[in-house]
């Protein structure tokens, strides 16, 4: 039976470039979608740029252009990058669209009518010059505890104390430099706590399509933490409003109030699909009505599970729509075992990869070969990337066609022999459903291992039958024809198995094979007495120099981007000079993160269990806003001040040092990287 499926990837934010971390998710999604289409299902893949919020508004102001102009330009760049990697969206839209405005307002009205919206008066700091309320990270001032200057509105980077912006001494706006005022403002809250019973049932439930869980096991465990046990819930109501000026959609009947970006961003899935439906004549309501029998899957990063597994299903359900069939999260991408680094050139943008002339299908294959159905981080090891692509794709796969096609063209007028009874091909067709199940369940790594095992069998058959020797022997034409026809058929089957991962190679192979297109049926059916075309080379080897040039290009692009910022004086002024003796008092050491977790009762602190080599310590750091998924820091090397006096962190415990981080221009805190080879306890200086 033909399935009706809607699939989405998380929406990239419209203020930065697409990098390989983004590509992990979009490759994972695209492979699954292409597999469904190969099987003949009606599968629609929709995405969009996430365009609203303060960062976009301020970025456009810095460029001196309207936000609408900036997001239009960014969308073109994003779509070009994704298209370059053969991501086959059926629609790539924008959250700044009439459809999204209508859906956001309709959902809000439905939630309000259902008693799930409440207004409350809150206090916030206000910039009188810019006439805007200021988020925590847009307020700076003097730390109320250690009196360090120029500290952010949520925590002190010198002593680690956390506080509210209203506690800062002599606060000023990071946007205009003026002194902010404390003002009251009416905000609107989605009463998420009242949705707990539904969410407990949905998060622990199974979808009606195949009985599989809505969430992965790791995600479900996290939801249980957030939802609480029994009748109690730890869910907080969600502030869904922001004050003008704000780039976004105005809340109905609330002039000057705008939807927070995380309300209208997931609604963007609906808007993109509605835009597609109107163009191709699909019934939108069939997919989103409360009793829909269609399927809807969201592929996301593990850092946004909270929004997609709690807010989004609750918003949909209590506004009269269906909830997702499944939400599938993936881990983060590291490069050579470490977080992507701009200084090392491993923060690789999609654009730089394409501009350096690397084949995007090399990366599609390598990423897919690392992915499974679990929420696990994956590592791009650049040496392994070179060897795996060259060995698997060039050495094992395309080489099969190259070794057989010439004989078919020269000796048999380009026509195959009927080899339907081939034992070799029977081995390949026998794996069709098993490999299909691997794709279906997102076990891509296993699927590709099994496919390469079949390629090994085919290559063993080549070596055992030696068509190049058969071609020299009298009376062996029929056997040569049979062997080469088996090899071309085997190549066709392998191409069909690999088509979700290598769509462009599959399309080029279809031309060579004289087929309209490769489908999943090609994993089972032989070609018969079929005429093929002249073989054209399908894939080149990866060269070490190409990878070296890619890394160097990313280093240079970062340096070039940093230069104007320095010239324009965008960095904070350098603090007053310190003597050498002052510096030598600070004992900075490398430490390994054994465990990092959120601190119950604090929205700002993370608790680090650290190994300093010579001893283990606990340090609290106010960087929770920058690392919403603290477990991702486990195993990472950090730099910490080892001789900082222990300090009591309110009710949370004693912090035995201070972890160093950098404050970025967008108000985030980023931990400092430690280069390869450094060990816990090593002195920094």
Swiss-Prot record:
Instruction: Give start-end ranges for motif 'KMSKS' region.
Output: 339-343
* Top EC class of this enzyme: ligase
Free-text remark on how the cofactor is bound: Binds 1 zinc ion per subunit.
Which residues does Zn(2+) bind? 143, 146, 156, 159
* Keyword Aminoacyl-tRNA synthetase among record annotations: yes
Cofactor(s) annotated in UniProt: Zn(2+)
Identify the EC number(s).
Answer: 6.1.1.10
Cellular component, GO annotation: cytoplasm
* tRNA-binding domain segment(s): 582-685
The alphabetized UniProt keywords are: Aminoacyl-tRNA synthetase, ATP-binding, Cytoplasm, Ligase, Metal-binding, Nucleotide-binding, Protein biosynthesis, RNA-binding, tRNA-binding, Zinc
One Pfam family here: tRNA_bind
NCBIfam families, alphabetically?
Answer: metG, metG_C_term, PRK00133.1
On subunit structure and binding partners, the annotation says:
Homodimer.
Which family, according to the similarity comment?
Belongs to the class-I aminoacyl-tRNA synthetase family. MetG type 1 subfamily.
What role is this protein assigned? Is required not only for elongation of protein synthesis but also for the initiation of all mRNA translation through initiator tRNA(fMet) aminoacylation.
- In its UniProt entry, what is this protein called? Methionine--tRNA ligase
- Origin organism is Neisseria meningitidis serogroup B (strain ATCC BAA-335 / MC58)
């Amino acid at each position: 039976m033909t399935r009706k499926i809607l699939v989405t990837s998380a929406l990239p934010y419209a203020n930065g470039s697409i990098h390989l971390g983004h590509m992990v998710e979009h490759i994972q999604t695209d492979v699954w979608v292409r597999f469904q289409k190969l099987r003949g299902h009606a599968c629609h893949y929709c995405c969009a740029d996430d365009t609203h919020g303060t960062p976009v508004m301020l970025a456009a102001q810095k460029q001196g252009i309207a936000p609408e102009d900036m997001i239009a330009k960014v969308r073109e760049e994003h779509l070009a990058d994704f298209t370059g990697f053969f991501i086959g969206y059926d629609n790539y839209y924008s959250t700044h669209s009439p459809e999204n405005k209508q859906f956001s307002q309709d959902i809000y009205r439905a939630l309000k009518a259902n008693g799930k919206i409440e207004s409350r008066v809150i206090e916030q700091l206000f910039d009188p010059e810019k006439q805007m309320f200021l988020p925590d990270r847009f307020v700076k001032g003097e730390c109320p505890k250690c009196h360090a200057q120029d500290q952010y509105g949520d925590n002190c980077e010198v002593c680690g104390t956390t506080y509210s912006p209203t506690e800062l001494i002599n606060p000023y706006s990071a946007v205009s430099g003026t002194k902010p005022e404390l003002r009251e403002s009416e905000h609107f809250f989605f009463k998420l706590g009242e949705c707990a019973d539904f969410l407990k049932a949905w998060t622990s439930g199974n979808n009606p399509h195949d009985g599989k869980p809505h969430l992965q096991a790791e995600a479900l465990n996290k939801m249980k933490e957030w939802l609480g046990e029994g009748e109690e819930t730890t869910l907080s109501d969600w502030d869904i409003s922001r004050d003008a000026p704000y780039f976004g959609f105005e809340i109905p009947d609330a002039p000057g109030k705008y939807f927070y970006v995380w309300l209208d961003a997931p609604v963007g899935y609906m808007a993109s699909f509605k835009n597609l439906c109107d163009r191709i004549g699909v019934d939108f309501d069939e997919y989103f009505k409360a009793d829909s029998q269609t399927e809807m899957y969201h592929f996301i990063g593990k850092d946004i599970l909270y929004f997609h597994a709690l807010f989004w299903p609750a918003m949909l359900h209590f506004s009269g729509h269906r909830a997702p069939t499944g939400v599938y999260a993936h881990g983060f991408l590291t490069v050579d075992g470490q977080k992507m680094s701009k200084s090392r050139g491993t923060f690789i943008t999609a654009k730089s990869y394409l501009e350096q002339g690397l084949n995007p299908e090399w990366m599609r294959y390598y990423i897919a070969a690392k992915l499974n159905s679990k929420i696990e981080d994956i590592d791009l090891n650049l040496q392994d990337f070179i060897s795996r692509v060259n060995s698997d794709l060039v050495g094992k796969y395309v080489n099969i066609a190259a070794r057989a096609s010439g004989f078919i063209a020269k000796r048999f007028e380009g026509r195959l022999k009927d080899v339907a009874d081939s034992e070799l091909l029977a081995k390949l067709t026998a794996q069709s459903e098993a490999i299909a199940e691997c794709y279906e369940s997102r076990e891509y790594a296993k699927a590709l291992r099994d496919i390469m095992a079949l390629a090994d069998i085919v290559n063993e058959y080549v070596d055992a039958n030696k068509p190049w020797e058969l071609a020299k022997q009298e009376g062996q034409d029929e056997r040569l024809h049979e062997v080469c026809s088996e090899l071309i058929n085997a190549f066709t089957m392998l191409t069909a198995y690999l088509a979700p991962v290598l769509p462009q190679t599959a399309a080029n192979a279809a031309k060579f094979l004289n087929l309209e297109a490769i489908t999943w049926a090609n994993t089972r059916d032989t070609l018969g007495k079929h005429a093929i075309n002249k073989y054209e080379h399908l894939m080149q080897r990866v060269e070490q120099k190409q990878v070296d040039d890619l890394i160097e290009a990313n280093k240079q692009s970062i340096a070039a981007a940093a230069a104007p910022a320095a010239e324009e004086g965008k960095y904070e002024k350098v603090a007053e000079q310190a003597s050498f003796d002052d510096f030598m008092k600070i004992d900075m050491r490398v430490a390994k993160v054994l465990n990092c977790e959120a601190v119950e009762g604090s929205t700002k602190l993370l608790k680090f269990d650290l190994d300093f080599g010579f001893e283990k310590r606990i340090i609290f750091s106010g960087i929770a806003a920058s690392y919403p998924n603290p477990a991702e820091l486990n195993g990472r090397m950090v730099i910490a001040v080892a001789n900082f006096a222990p300090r009591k962190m309110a009710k949370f415990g004693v912090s035995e040092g201070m972890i160093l981080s950098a404050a970025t221009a967008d108000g985030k805190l980023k931990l400092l990287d430690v280069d390869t080879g450094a060990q816990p306890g090593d002195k920094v200086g």
